[in-house]
Protein backbone atom coordinates (compact mmCIF):
# COMPACT_ATOMS: atom_id res chain seq x y z
CA UNK A 1 0.00 0.00 0.00
CA UNK A 2 2.81 2.43 0.92
CA UNK A 3 4.56 1.57 -2.33
CA UNK A 4 1.40 2.34 -4.27
CA UNK A 5 0.98 5.68 -2.47
CA UNK A 6 4.59 6.57 -3.12
CA UNK A 7 4.23 5.70 -6.79
CA UNK A 8 1.08 7.80 -7.12
CA UNK A 9 2.79 10.71 -5.39
CA UNK A 10 5.77 10.40 -7.70
CA UNK A 11 3.52 10.29 -10.80
CA UNK A 12 1.60 13.33 -9.56
CA UNK A 13 4.85 15.19 -8.92
CA UNK A 14 6.16 14.40 -12.43
CA UNK A 15 2.84 15.44 -13.96
CA UNK A 16 3.00 18.71 -12.02
CA UNK A 17 6.52 19.38 -13.28
CA UNK A 18 5.50 18.63 -16.86
CA UNK A 19 2.44 20.86 -16.59
CA UNK A 20 4.51 23.63 -15.04
CA UNK A 21 7.16 23.42 -17.76
CA UNK A 22 4.54 23.49 -20.52
CA UNK A 23 2.75 26.40 -18.87
CA UNK A 24 6.05 28.25 -18.55
CA UNK A 25 7.04 27.52 -22.14
CA UNK A 26 3.68 28.48 -23.66
CA UNK A 27 3.29 32.15 -22.86
CA UNK A 28 0.41 34.57 -23.23
CA UNK A 29 1.36 37.77 -25.06
CA UNK A 30 -0.82 40.80 -24.32
CA UNK A 31 -0.99 43.70 -26.76
CA UNK A 32 -3.11 46.78 -27.27
CA UNK A 33 -3.90 47.99 -30.79
CA UNK A 34 -5.20 51.55 -30.97
CA UNK A 35 -6.77 52.23 -34.35
CA UNK A 36 -6.27 55.91 -35.12
CA UNK A 37 -5.70 58.46 -37.85
CA UNK A 38 -2.03 59.37 -38.18
CA UNK A 39 -0.30 61.85 -40.46
CA UNK A 40 1.81 59.84 -42.91
CA UNK A 41 3.90 61.49 -45.62
CA UNK A 42 4.71 59.60 -48.80
CA UNK A 43 5.39 60.76 -52.37
CA UNK A 44 5.68 64.39 -51.17
CA UNK A 45 2.12 64.42 -49.79
CA UNK A 46 0.78 64.01 -46.25
CA UNK A 47 -2.37 61.99 -45.55
CA UNK A 48 -4.37 61.19 -42.43
CA UNK A 49 -3.91 57.44 -42.70
CA UNK A 50 -5.52 54.84 -40.47
CA UNK A 51 -2.81 53.09 -38.44
CA UNK A 52 -2.26 50.89 -35.41
CA UNK A 53 -0.57 52.73 -32.53
CA UNK A 54 0.51 55.45 -34.96
CA UNK A 55 2.78 53.01 -36.82
CA UNK A 56 2.89 52.26 -40.55
CA UNK A 57 3.30 49.35 -41.02
CA UNK A 58 1.89 48.29 -37.68
CA UNK A 59 3.56 46.51 -34.75
CA UNK A 60 5.53 43.31 -35.33
CA UNK A 61 4.22 40.49 -33.14
CA UNK A 62 6.67 37.76 -32.09
CA UNK A 63 5.52 34.48 -30.53
CA UNK A 64 6.52 30.84 -30.26
CA UNK A 65 4.52 27.90 -31.52
CA UNK A 66 2.09 27.09 -28.69
CA UNK A 67 1.83 30.64 -27.35
CA UNK A 68 -1.40 32.57 -26.90
CA UNK A 69 -2.03 36.07 -28.23
CA UNK A 70 -4.41 38.45 -26.47
CA UNK A 71 -4.87 41.65 -28.47
CA UNK A 72 -7.28 44.36 -27.37
CA UNK A 73 -8.29 46.49 -30.35
CA UNK A 74 -9.55 49.98 -29.46
CA UNK A 75 -11.13 51.83 -32.36
CA UNK A 76 -10.46 55.58 -32.24
CA UNK A 77 -10.81 56.01 -36.00
CA UNK A 78 -13.92 57.11 -37.88
CA UNK A 79 -14.42 53.80 -39.67
CA UNK A 80 -15.68 50.42 -38.57
CA UNK A 81 -12.82 47.92 -38.40
CA UNK A 82 -11.89 44.30 -37.72
CA UNK A 83 -8.48 42.61 -37.56
CA UNK A 84 -7.76 39.28 -39.29
CA UNK A 85 -4.85 37.10 -38.18
CA UNK A 86 -3.92 35.84 -41.62
CA UNK A 87 -3.04 32.15 -41.69
CA UNK A 88 -3.70 31.43 -38.01
CA UNK A 89 -5.69 28.19 -37.81
CA UNK A 90 -7.95 29.54 -35.01
CA UNK A 91 -8.76 26.04 -33.76
CA UNK A 92 -12.22 26.35 -32.15
CA UNK A 93 -11.66 30.14 -31.82
CA UNK A 94 -13.41 31.32 -34.97
CA UNK A 95 -14.73 34.35 -33.06
CA UNK A 96 -11.16 35.70 -33.25
CA UNK A 97 -10.66 35.21 -36.99
CA UNK A 98 -11.75 38.73 -37.86
CA UNK A 99 -13.42 39.01 -41.31
CA UNK A 100 -16.18 41.61 -41.12
CA UNK A 101 -19.71 40.14 -41.06
CA UNK A 102 -18.32 36.61 -41.37
CA UNK A 103 -17.10 35.79 -37.85
CA UNK A 104 -17.96 39.08 -36.17
CA UNK A 105 -19.68 42.39 -36.57
CA UNK A 106 -17.22 45.27 -36.98
CA UNK A 107 -15.71 47.19 -34.09
CA UNK A 108 -17.47 50.54 -34.23
CA UNK A 109 -15.72 53.86 -33.61
CA UNK A 110 -15.32 54.33 -29.87
CA UNK A 111 -15.64 50.60 -29.17
CA UNK A 112 -13.18 47.79 -28.50
CA UNK A 113 -12.85 44.03 -28.85
CA UNK A 114 -10.25 41.60 -27.53
CA UNK A 115 -8.96 38.86 -29.82
CA UNK A 116 -7.70 35.79 -27.96
CA UNK A 117 -6.26 32.74 -29.72
CA UNK A 118 -3.44 30.20 -29.55
CA UNK A 119 -0.88 29.36 -32.23
CA UNK A 120 -1.06 25.59 -32.68
CA UNK A 121 1.35 23.60 -34.82
CA UNK A 122 2.47 26.52 -36.97
CA UNK A 123 5.99 27.95 -37.36
CA UNK A 124 7.23 30.59 -39.76
CA UNK A 125 5.75 33.82 -41.06
CA UNK A 126 2.15 34.91 -40.73
CA UNK A 127 0.71 38.41 -40.60
CA UNK A 128 -2.29 40.43 -39.52
CA UNK A 129 -4.38 43.04 -41.32
CA UNK A 130 -7.66 44.90 -41.27
CA UNK A 131 -10.55 42.98 -42.83
CA UNK A 132 -12.94 45.89 -43.35
CA UNK A 133 -13.26 47.96 -46.51
CA UNK A 134 -9.76 48.78 -47.81
CA UNK A 135 -8.33 49.70 -44.42
CA UNK A 136 -5.68 47.02 -44.74
CA UNK A 137 -3.86 49.35 -47.16
CA UNK A 138 -2.26 50.84 -44.03
CA UNK A 139 -3.45 48.59 -41.19
CA UNK A 140 -1.18 45.56 -41.32
CA UNK A 141 1.89 44.03 -39.70
CA UNK A 142 3.95 40.87 -39.35
CA UNK A 143 3.34 37.92 -37.04
CA UNK A 144 6.53 35.89 -36.59
CA UNK A 145 6.11 32.40 -35.14
CA UNK A 146 9.30 30.82 -33.80
CA UNK A 147 9.75 27.17 -32.80
CA UNK A 148 8.85 26.30 -29.20
CA UNK A 149 11.46 26.99 -26.54
CA UNK A 150 14.14 24.33 -26.75
CA UNK A 151 13.39 23.53 -30.40
CA UNK A 152 15.18 24.80 -33.47
CA UNK A 153 14.67 25.44 -37.16
CA UNK A 154 15.01 22.49 -39.57
CA UNK A 155 17.67 24.55 -41.34
CA UNK A 156 20.81 26.46 -40.36
CA UNK A 157 19.89 28.99 -37.71
CA UNK A 158 20.10 32.50 -39.20
CA UNK A 159 21.95 35.31 -37.49
CA UNK A 160 18.87 37.52 -37.72
CA UNK A 161 15.23 37.57 -38.85
CA UNK A 162 14.14 40.46 -41.07
CA UNK A 163 10.46 40.87 -42.00
CA UNK A 164 9.87 42.56 -45.35
CA UNK A 165 6.28 43.65 -45.93
CA UNK A 166 5.50 44.41 -49.56
CA UNK A 167 2.63 46.85 -49.87
CA UNK A 168 0.80 49.42 -51.96
CA UNK A 169 0.37 53.14 -51.34
CA UNK A 170 -2.38 55.38 -52.65
CA UNK A 171 -1.88 59.13 -52.85
CA UNK A 172 -5.51 59.25 -51.70
CA UNK A 173 -7.77 57.77 -49.04
CA UNK A 174 -8.05 54.04 -49.92
CA UNK A 175 -11.57 53.90 -48.44
CA UNK A 176 -12.64 56.66 -50.84
CA UNK A 177 -11.00 54.80 -53.74
CA UNK A 178 -13.12 51.74 -52.99
CA UNK A 179 -16.31 53.75 -52.44
CA UNK A 180 -15.91 55.48 -55.79
CA UNK A 181 -15.38 52.15 -57.51
CA UNK A 182 -18.51 50.69 -55.93
CA UNK A 183 -20.50 53.80 -56.82
CA UNK A 184 -19.52 53.85 -60.49
CA UNK A 185 -19.17 50.11 -61.08
CA UNK A 186 -15.73 50.63 -62.60
CA UNK A 187 -12.35 49.24 -61.62
CA UNK A 188 -10.73 51.07 -58.68
CA UNK A 189 -7.84 53.40 -59.30
CA UNK A 190 -4.43 51.75 -59.18
CA UNK A 191 -2.08 52.49 -56.32
CA UNK A 192 0.58 55.17 -56.81
CA UNK A 193 3.51 53.18 -55.41
CA UNK A 194 4.59 49.82 -54.14
CA UNK A 195 6.38 49.76 -50.80
CA UNK A 196 8.80 47.69 -48.72
CA UNK A 197 8.15 48.09 -45.00
CA UNK A 198 6.01 51.10 -45.79
CA UNK A 199 8.62 52.94 -47.89
CA UNK A 200 8.45 53.30 -51.70
CA UNK A 201 12.22 53.49 -52.11
CA UNK A 202 14.72 55.34 -54.26
CA UNK A 203 12.87 55.18 -57.57
CA UNK A 204 9.91 57.29 -56.42
CA UNK A 205 9.76 61.02 -55.78
CA UNK A 206 10.47 62.32 -52.27
CA UNK A 207 11.33 58.83 -51.04
CA UNK A 208 15.06 58.08 -51.18
CA UNK A 209 15.96 59.46 -47.74
CA UNK A 210 13.65 56.94 -46.04
CA UNK A 211 14.37 53.87 -48.15
CA UNK A 212 14.39 50.69 -46.05
CA UNK A 213 17.96 49.52 -45.37
CA UNK A 214 18.81 45.95 -44.31
CA UNK A 215 22.37 45.68 -42.91
CA UNK A 216 24.41 42.50 -43.34
CA UNK A 217 27.93 41.35 -42.45
CA UNK A 218 30.19 39.40 -44.76
CA UNK A 219 29.54 35.70 -44.18
CA UNK A 220 26.34 36.35 -42.25
CA UNK A 221 23.08 34.51 -43.08
CA UNK A 222 19.78 36.24 -42.42
CA UNK A 223 16.22 35.01 -42.80
CA UNK A 224 14.09 37.33 -44.89
CA UNK A 225 10.43 36.88 -44.00
CA UNK A 226 8.73 38.28 -47.11
CA UNK A 227 5.01 39.10 -46.91
CA UNK A 228 2.85 40.34 -49.77
CA UNK A 229 0.51 42.72 -48.00
CA UNK A 230 -0.42 44.56 -51.20
CA UNK A 231 -4.13 44.92 -51.84
CA UNK A 232 -4.39 44.03 -55.50
CA UNK A 233 -1.07 42.95 -56.96
CA UNK A 234 1.02 39.77 -57.06
CA UNK A 235 4.67 40.79 -56.86
CA UNK A 236 8.07 39.54 -57.95
CA UNK A 237 10.88 40.03 -55.41
CA UNK A 238 14.63 39.66 -55.83
CA UNK A 239 17.99 40.85 -54.45
CA UNK A 240 20.76 41.97 -56.78
CA UNK A 241 23.59 39.40 -57.19
CA UNK A 242 22.34 37.19 -54.33
CA UNK A 243 20.77 33.75 -54.28
CA UNK A 244 17.62 33.19 -52.24
CA UNK A 245 17.14 29.83 -50.51
CA UNK A 246 13.43 29.22 -49.92
CA UNK A 247 12.80 27.33 -46.66
CA UNK A 248 9.18 28.07 -45.80
CA UNK A 249 5.90 29.59 -46.89
CA UNK A 250 2.66 30.45 -45.07
CA UNK A 251 4.15 29.20 -41.76
CA UNK A 252 5.00 25.74 -43.12
CA UNK A 253 8.49 24.39 -43.77
CA UNK A 254 9.61 23.41 -47.27
CA UNK A 255 12.36 21.35 -48.80
CA UNK A 256 14.95 24.10 -49.39
CA UNK A 257 15.54 25.23 -52.95
CA UNK A 258 17.53 28.10 -54.42
CA UNK A 259 16.23 30.74 -56.79
CA UNK A 260 17.03 34.22 -58.07
CA UNK A 261 13.48 35.52 -57.72
CA UNK A 262 10.36 34.72 -55.72
CA UNK A 263 6.75 35.62 -56.46
CA UNK A 264 3.99 36.14 -53.94
CA UNK A 265 0.30 36.73 -54.40
CA UNK A 266 -1.40 39.06 -51.92
CA UNK A 267 -1.70 37.23 -48.62
CA UNK A 268 1.20 34.85 -49.19
CA UNK A 269 4.43 34.73 -47.18
CA UNK A 270 7.79 33.23 -48.13
CA UNK A 271 10.82 32.66 -45.91
CA UNK A 272 14.20 32.86 -47.66
CA UNK A 273 17.77 32.59 -46.40
CA UNK A 274 20.29 35.02 -47.85
CA UNK A 275 24.03 34.98 -47.15
CA UNK A 276 26.49 37.87 -47.28
CA UNK A 277 28.76 36.19 -49.82
CA UNK A 278 29.23 39.06 -52.28
CA UNK A 279 31.78 41.90 -52.34
CA UNK A 280 30.87 44.46 -49.67
CA UNK A 281 28.61 46.94 -51.39
CA UNK A 282 25.02 48.12 -51.56
CA UNK A 283 22.51 45.94 -53.39
CA UNK A 284 18.92 46.73 -54.22
CA UNK A 285 16.16 44.47 -52.99
CA UNK A 286 13.37 45.11 -55.45
CA UNK A 287 9.73 44.21 -56.09
CA UNK A 288 7.52 44.85 -59.09
CA UNK A 289 4.16 43.67 -60.37
CA UNK A 290 3.27 40.32 -61.85
CA UNK A 291 0.27 41.19 -64.03
CA UNK A 292 -1.59 38.31 -65.68
CA UNK A 293 -4.86 40.00 -66.68
CA UNK A 294 -4.55 41.14 -70.27
CA UNK A 295 -5.23 44.80 -71.04
CA UNK A 296 -5.90 45.61 -67.38
CA UNK A 297 -4.11 48.73 -66.13
CA UNK A 298 -1.62 48.30 -63.29
CA UNK A 299 1.23 50.12 -61.60
CA UNK A 300 4.31 49.27 -63.66
CA UNK A 301 6.82 50.67 -61.17
CA UNK A 302 9.45 49.17 -58.87
CA UNK A 303 9.86 49.51 -55.11
CA UNK A 304 13.31 49.10 -53.58
CA UNK A 305 15.06 48.52 -50.29
CA UNK A 306 18.83 48.23 -49.83
CA UNK A 307 20.88 45.26 -48.65
CA UNK A 308 23.87 47.11 -47.27
CA UNK A 309 27.10 45.41 -46.20
CA UNK A 310 28.33 46.97 -42.99
CA UNK A 311 31.88 47.02 -44.37
CA UNK A 312 30.87 48.62 -47.68
CA UNK A 313 33.21 51.57 -48.43
CA UNK A 314 30.45 54.01 -49.06
CA UNK A 315 27.63 55.44 -47.35
CA UNK A 316 25.94 57.63 -44.87
CA UNK A 317 23.97 55.71 -42.28
CA UNK A 318 20.25 55.11 -42.68
CA UNK A 319 19.64 56.80 -46.00
CA UNK A 320 18.79 55.67 -49.46
CA UNK A 321 20.90 56.08 -52.54
CA UNK A 322 20.83 59.84 -52.15
CA UNK A 323 23.35 59.82 -49.30
CA UNK A 324 26.24 60.50 -51.69
CA UNK A 325 26.34 62.55 -54.85
CA UNK A 326 27.13 60.82 -58.11
CA UNK A 327 26.69 57.20 -59.09
CA UNK A 328 29.72 55.60 -57.42
CA UNK A 329 27.75 54.55 -54.37
CA UNK A 330 24.40 53.85 -55.97
CA UNK A 331 23.18 50.36 -55.08
CA UNK A 332 23.45 47.64 -57.69
CA UNK A 333 20.12 47.04 -59.43
CA UNK A 334 18.82 43.49 -59.98
CA UNK A 335 17.14 42.16 -63.10
CA UNK A 336 13.45 41.52 -62.49
CA UNK A 337 11.18 39.35 -64.66
CA UNK A 338 8.88 40.99 -67.16
CA UNK A 339 5.52 41.94 -65.66
CA UNK A 340 3.76 39.14 -67.59
CA UNK A 341 6.36 36.39 -67.07
CA UNK A 342 4.01 33.53 -66.19
CA UNK A 343 6.73 30.96 -66.96
CA UNK A 344 8.83 32.23 -64.04
CA UNK A 345 5.77 32.14 -61.78
CA UNK A 346 5.05 28.55 -62.79
CA UNK A 347 8.62 27.35 -62.27
CA UNK A 348 8.66 28.93 -58.85
CA UNK A 349 5.32 27.55 -57.63
CA UNK A 350 6.08 24.06 -58.91
CA UNK A 351 9.33 23.98 -56.89
CA UNK A 352 7.42 23.83 -53.60
CA UNK A 353 7.57 20.56 -51.64
CA UNK A 354 6.76 19.95 -47.98
CA UNK A 355 9.81 19.25 -45.87
CA UNK A 356 8.49 15.87 -44.75
CA UNK A 357 5.98 13.36 -46.00
CA UNK A 358 2.58 15.02 -45.91
CA UNK A 359 -0.57 13.61 -44.34
CA UNK A 360 -2.72 14.20 -47.41
CA UNK A 361 -6.22 12.72 -47.30
CA UNK A 362 -6.40 10.01 -49.95
CA UNK A 363 -10.10 9.20 -49.60
CA UNK A 364 -12.46 12.09 -50.38
CA UNK A 365 -15.88 12.77 -48.82
CA UNK A 366 -16.59 16.15 -50.43
CA UNK A 367 -15.46 16.88 -53.98
CA UNK A 368 -16.01 20.44 -55.19
CA UNK A 369 -15.31 22.01 -58.56
CA UNK A 370 -15.27 25.80 -58.16
CA UNK A 371 -15.01 28.19 -61.08
CA UNK A 372 -13.46 31.60 -60.48
CA UNK A 373 -14.32 34.53 -62.66
CA UNK A 374 -15.14 38.17 -63.05
CA UNK A 375 -18.41 39.33 -64.54
CA UNK A 376 -20.32 42.31 -65.85
CA UNK A 377 -23.75 43.40 -64.69
CA UNK A 378 -25.97 45.75 -66.62
CA UNK A 379 -26.09 49.28 -65.33
CA UNK A 380 -29.29 49.98 -63.31
CA UNK A 381 -31.84 51.97 -65.29
CA UNK A 382 -32.09 54.57 -62.53
CA UNK A 383 -28.31 55.05 -62.22
CA UNK A 384 -27.66 58.78 -61.77
CA UNK A 385 -25.04 59.24 -64.47
CA UNK A 386 -26.96 56.86 -66.78
CA UNK A 387 -23.76 55.06 -67.60
CA UNK A 388 -21.69 52.85 -65.35
CA UNK A 389 -17.92 52.87 -65.76
CA UNK A 390 -17.27 49.18 -66.35
CA UNK A 391 -16.66 47.89 -69.91
CA UNK A 392 -19.35 49.11 -72.33
CA UNK A 393 -21.26 50.90 -69.60
CA UNK A 394 -21.57 47.91 -67.26
CA UNK A 395 -20.67 47.24 -63.62
CA UNK A 396 -17.91 44.85 -62.56
CA UNK A 397 -18.87 41.83 -60.53
CA UNK A 398 -17.21 38.51 -59.67
CA UNK A 399 -18.27 35.05 -58.57
CA UNK A 400 -17.49 31.48 -57.62
CA UNK A 401 -19.67 28.90 -59.38
CA UNK A 402 -21.79 31.75 -60.72
CA UNK A 403 -22.63 33.03 -57.21
CA UNK A 404 -21.48 36.53 -56.32
CA UNK A 405 -21.03 36.51 -52.55
CA UNK A 406 -23.03 39.05 -50.54
CA UNK A 407 -22.10 39.76 -46.93
CA UNK A 408 -24.93 40.22 -44.41
CA UNK A 409 -25.21 43.44 -42.43
CA UNK A 410 -27.37 42.75 -39.37
CA UNK A 411 -25.51 39.71 -38.06
CA UNK A 412 -22.25 37.97 -38.75
CA UNK A 413 -22.54 34.57 -40.40
CA UNK A 414 -20.99 32.84 -37.40
CA UNK A 415 -23.37 34.58 -34.98
CA UNK A 416 -26.35 33.63 -37.14
CA UNK A 417 -25.19 30.01 -37.27
CA UNK A 418 -24.34 29.77 -33.57
CA UNK A 419 -27.63 31.30 -32.40
CA UNK A 420 -29.83 29.72 -35.08
CA UNK A 421 -30.95 33.04 -36.54
CA UNK A 422 -32.90 32.38 -39.77
CA UNK A 423 -32.81 34.35 -43.00
CA UNK A 424 -29.16 35.43 -42.84
CA UNK A 425 -27.70 32.80 -45.17
CA UNK A 426 -28.53 29.60 -47.01
CA UNK A 427 -26.47 26.42 -47.29
CA UNK A 428 -26.97 25.76 -50.99
CA UNK A 429 -23.67 26.90 -52.47
CA UNK A 430 -23.29 24.63 -55.51
CA UNK A 431 -20.55 21.97 -55.51
CA UNK A 432 -20.04 22.57 -59.23
CA UNK A 433 -20.86 25.36 -61.70
CA UNK A 434 -24.47 25.41 -62.94
CA UNK A 435 -23.28 25.31 -66.55
CA UNK A 436 -20.36 23.36 -67.93
CA UNK A 437 -18.46 25.30 -70.61
CA UNK A 438 -15.00 25.78 -72.08
CA UNK A 439 -13.74 27.62 -69.00
CA UNK A 440 -10.53 28.93 -70.53
CA UNK A 441 -11.79 29.32 -74.09
CA UNK A 442 -11.94 32.54 -76.08
CA UNK A 443 -15.65 32.45 -76.98
CA UNK A 444 -17.47 32.32 -73.67
CA UNK A 445 -21.17 33.09 -73.91
CA UNK A 446 -22.13 36.54 -72.63
CA UNK A 447 -25.00 34.86 -70.78
CA UNK A 448 -22.39 33.66 -68.26
CA UNK A 449 -21.19 37.18 -67.47
CA UNK A 450 -24.01 38.00 -65.02
CA UNK A 451 -23.87 35.81 -61.89
CA UNK A 452 -26.51 35.35 -59.24
CA UNK A 453 -25.99 37.22 -55.99
CA UNK A 454 -26.47 35.58 -52.63
CA UNK A 455 -25.13 34.57 -49.23
CA UNK A 456 -24.72 30.88 -49.94
CA UNK A 457 -22.61 28.64 -47.70
CA UNK A 458 -21.44 25.07 -48.23
CA UNK A 459 -21.99 22.78 -45.24
CA UNK A 460 -19.30 20.29 -44.21
CA UNK A 461 -19.54 17.62 -41.54
CA UNK A 462 -16.75 17.68 -38.97
CA UNK A 463 -13.88 15.52 -40.16
CA UNK A 464 -14.88 15.56 -43.83
CA UNK A 465 -12.05 14.97 -46.27
CA UNK A 466 -12.36 17.73 -48.84
CA UNK A 467 -10.97 18.21 -52.34
CA UNK A 468 -11.52 21.43 -54.28
CA UNK A 469 -10.62 22.00 -57.91
CA UNK A 470 -10.21 25.77 -58.35
CA UNK A 471 -10.70 26.60 -62.03
CA UNK A 472 -9.88 30.01 -63.49
CA UNK A 473 -12.15 31.19 -66.30
CA UNK A 474 -11.87 33.62 -69.18
CA UNK A 475 -15.04 35.49 -68.23
CA UNK A 476 -14.07 39.14 -68.84
CA UNK A 477 -10.39 38.12 -68.61
CA UNK A 478 -8.39 35.20 -67.23
CA UNK A 479 -6.16 36.08 -64.31
CA UNK A 480 -3.98 34.58 -61.59
CA UNK A 481 -6.17 34.62 -58.48
CA UNK A 482 -4.66 34.24 -54.97
CA UNK A 483 -7.37 32.23 -53.18
CA UNK A 484 -7.21 32.32 -49.38
CA UNK A 485 -9.10 29.95 -47.06
CA UNK A 486 -9.67 31.11 -43.50
CA UNK A 487 -9.33 28.68 -40.61
CA UNK A 488 -7.37 26.08 -42.55
CA UNK A 489 -4.13 25.14 -44.20
CA UNK A 490 -4.49 22.95 -47.28
CA UNK A 491 -2.27 20.84 -49.48
CA UNK A 492 -1.78 22.03 -53.06
CA UNK A 493 -1.59 18.64 -54.76
CA UNK A 494 -1.54 19.82 -58.39
CA UNK A 495 -1.85 22.79 -60.70
CA UNK A 496 -1.90 23.25 -64.45
CA UNK A 497 -3.17 25.23 -67.41
CA UNK A 498 -6.34 24.94 -69.46
CA UNK A 499 -9.46 23.15 -68.26
CA UNK A 500 -8.99 20.60 -65.48
CA UNK A 501 -9.44 17.10 -66.90
CA UNK A 502 -10.06 14.50 -64.16
CA UNK A 503 -9.23 11.64 -66.52
CA UNK A 504 -5.66 12.75 -67.15
CA UNK A 505 -4.81 15.45 -64.61
CA UNK A 506 -5.28 13.23 -61.56
CA UNK A 507 -2.07 11.51 -62.63
CA UNK A 508 -0.28 14.75 -61.71
CA UNK A 509 -1.46 14.67 -58.09
CA UNK A 510 1.38 14.86 -55.57
CA UNK A 511 0.19 12.92 -52.53
CA UNK A 512 3.68 12.48 -51.06
CA UNK A 513 5.06 15.92 -50.24
CA UNK A 514 2.78 18.70 -51.56
CA UNK A 515 3.20 22.14 -49.97
CA UNK A 516 0.91 23.19 -47.13
CA UNK A 517 -0.44 26.71 -47.71
CA UNK A 518 -3.31 28.98 -46.72
CA UNK A 519 -3.31 30.93 -50.00
CA UNK A 520 -2.94 29.40 -53.46
CA UNK A 521 -2.21 31.26 -56.67
CA UNK A 522 -4.63 29.72 -59.17
CA UNK A 523 -2.76 29.96 -62.49
CA UNK A 524 -4.03 32.34 -65.14
CA UNK A 525 -6.14 30.31 -67.57
CA UNK A 526 -5.52 27.29 -65.37
CA UNK A 527 -6.45 25.37 -62.25
CA UNK A 528 -5.22 24.20 -58.86
CA UNK A 529 -6.35 21.28 -56.69
CA UNK A 530 -6.31 21.50 -52.90
CA UNK A 531 -7.17 19.06 -50.12
CA UNK A 532 -7.81 19.42 -46.39
CA UNK A 533 -9.68 17.80 -43.51
CA UNK A 534 -12.56 19.83 -42.07
CA UNK A 535 -11.41 19.59 -38.44
CA UNK A 536 -12.14 23.17 -37.34
CA UNK A 537 -15.82 23.97 -36.67
CA UNK A 538 -17.17 27.39 -37.58
CA UNK A 539 -17.84 29.59 -40.59
CA UNK A 540 -14.80 30.10 -42.80
CA UNK A 541 -14.68 32.36 -45.83
CA UNK A 542 -12.71 31.42 -48.94
CA UNK A 543 -11.99 34.41 -51.15
CA UNK A 544 -9.72 36.00 -53.69
CA UNK A 545 -7.10 38.09 -51.91
CA UNK A 546 -7.18 40.75 -54.62
CA UNK A 547 -9.32 43.17 -52.64
CA UNK A 548 -10.96 44.62 -55.74
CA UNK A 549 -12.25 41.14 -56.51
CA UNK A 550 -13.59 40.36 -53.04
CA UNK A 551 -15.45 43.68 -53.09
CA UNK A 552 -17.12 42.43 -56.30
CA UNK A 553 -18.15 39.13 -54.68
CA UNK A 554 -15.32 36.69 -55.47
CA UNK A 555 -15.86 34.60 -52.34
CA UNK A 556 -17.86 31.84 -50.68
CA UNK A 557 -17.89 30.34 -47.18
CA UNK A 558 -17.88 26.93 -45.56
CA UNK A 559 -20.03 26.07 -42.57
CA UNK A 560 -18.17 23.32 -40.71
CA UNK A 561 -20.42 21.62 -38.20
CA UNK A 562 -19.39 20.74 -34.66
CA UNK A 563 -18.14 17.23 -34.07
CA UNK A 564 -18.43 15.14 -30.91
CA UNK A 565 -17.45 16.55 -27.55
CA UNK A 566 -15.90 19.78 -26.38
CA UNK A 567 -12.67 19.47 -28.38
CA UNK A 568 -14.64 19.25 -31.63
CA UNK A 569 -16.97 22.14 -30.81
CA UNK A 570 -16.43 25.85 -31.37
CA UNK A 571 -15.96 27.86 -28.19
CA UNK A 572 -18.73 30.07 -26.85
CA UNK A 573 -18.66 33.66 -28.15
CA UNK A 574 -16.69 36.16 -26.04
CA UNK A 575 -18.64 38.53 -23.82
CA UNK A 576 -17.35 41.61 -25.67
CA UNK A 577 -18.13 40.36 -29.19
CA UNK A 578 -19.30 43.41 -31.19
CA UNK A 579 -22.92 43.72 -32.25
CA UNK A 580 -24.03 45.04 -35.63
Swiss-Prot record:
Residues annotated to bind Cu cation 2: 86, 129, 545
EC number: 1.10.3.2
Record key words, sorted: Apoplast, Copper, Glycoprotein, Lignin degradation, Metal-binding, Oxidoreductase, Repeat, Secreted, Signal
Cofactor: Cu cation
Gene Ontology CC entries for this record: apoplast; Casparian strip
GO MF: copper ion binding; hydroquinone:oxygen oxidoreductase activity
Pfam families named among the record's database cross-references: Cu-oxidase, Cu-oxidase_2, Cu-oxidase_3
Signal sequence interval, chain numbering: 1-25
Manner of cofactor binding, per the entry note: Binds 4 Cu cations per monomer.
Physiological role: Lignin degradation and detoxification of lignin-derived products.
Protein name, entry field: Laccase-5
Species whose genome carries this gene: Arabidopsis thaliana
Amino acid sequence: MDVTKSLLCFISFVAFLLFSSVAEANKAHHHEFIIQATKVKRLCETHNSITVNGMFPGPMLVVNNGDTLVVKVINRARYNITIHWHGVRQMRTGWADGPEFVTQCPIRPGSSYTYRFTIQGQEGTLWWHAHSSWLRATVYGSLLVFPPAGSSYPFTKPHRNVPLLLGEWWDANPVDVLRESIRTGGAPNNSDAYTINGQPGDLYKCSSQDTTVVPINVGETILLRVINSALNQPLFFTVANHKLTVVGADASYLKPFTTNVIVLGPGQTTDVLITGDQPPNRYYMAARAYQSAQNAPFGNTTTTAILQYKSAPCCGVGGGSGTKKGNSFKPIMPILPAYNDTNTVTRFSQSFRSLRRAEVPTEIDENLFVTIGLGLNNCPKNFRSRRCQGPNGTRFTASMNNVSFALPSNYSLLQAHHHGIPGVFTTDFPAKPPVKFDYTGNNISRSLYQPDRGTKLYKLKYGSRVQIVLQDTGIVTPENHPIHLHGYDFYIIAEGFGNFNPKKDTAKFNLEDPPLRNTVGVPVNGWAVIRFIADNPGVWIMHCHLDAHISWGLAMAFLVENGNGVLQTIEQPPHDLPVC
